[in-house]
């Protein structure tokens, strides 16, 4: 964040509404605050927060967070990770830290994935961003935004000077053609 006190940083945005801030504050009890966890209701500030010891059934793991809270889950075996992801709704973002990123990509489905990093798939406007399943449909950023919010229309234009009878039932001419072939 390039600052020792993110609360005073001009570039660090505030939470959009009181309701959204209350929802995010309620997530702070869903695990152990490893870093951050500070908030100010009057300015709708919530510090970047890392949560550990989070139960997979905790509300912070059931909903899309849309705030500066990063729950961290640890696994002993890579198969546990892919099984965990497969049993839930497809996430908008999947962040994996480890040496088996290719395995994660082959065995999971998510809107976007970062291997050994976070958020970069969202801030890079040359990469499509969007969800899958409950986390959304379609993508945006750059050309993807144009394609998502455009409509490609299918058009069939038949000539008016001739109307081929073999297009209509009963398809006798089609049977004749099949016999000849």
Language model features: what each stretch is:
Residues 32-38:
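Short secondary-structure junctions
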Residues 1-26, 38-45, 62-67, 125-126, ...:
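Flexible, acidic loop-helix segments that line cofactor/substrate-binding pockets
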Residues 45-181:
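Conserved C-terminal structural/oligomerization subdomain of aldehyde/semialdehyde dehydrogenase
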Residues 3-4, 30, 151-155:
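A structural signal for alpha-helix termini and helix-coil/disorder junctions
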Residues 26-32:
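Basic phosphate/pyrophosphate-binding loop/patch that engages nucleotide-derived ligands
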């Amino acid at each position: 964040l390039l600052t020792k006190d993110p609360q005073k940083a001009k570039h660090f945005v505030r939470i959009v509404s009181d309701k959204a801030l209350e929802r995010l504050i309620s997530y702070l009890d869903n695990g152990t605050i490893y870093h951050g966890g500070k908030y100010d209701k009057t300015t709708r500030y919530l510090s970047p927060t890392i949560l550990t010891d989070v139960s997979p059934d905790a509300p912070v793991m059931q909903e899309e967070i849309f705030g500066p809270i990063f729950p961290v889950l640890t696994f002993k075996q890579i198969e546990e990770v892919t099984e965990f992801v497969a049993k839930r709704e497809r996430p908008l973002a999947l962040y994996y830290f480890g040496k088996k990123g290719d395995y994660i990509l082959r065995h999971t489905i998510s809107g976007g994935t970062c291997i050994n990093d976070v958020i970069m798939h969202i801030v890079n406007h040359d990469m499509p961003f969007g969800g899958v399943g409950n986390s959304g449909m379609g993508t945006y950023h750059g050309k993807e935004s144009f394609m998502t919010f455009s409509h490609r229309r299918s058009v069939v234009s038949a000539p008016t000077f001739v109307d081929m009878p073999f297009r209509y039932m009963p398809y006798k001419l089609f049977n004749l053609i099949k016999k000849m072939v």
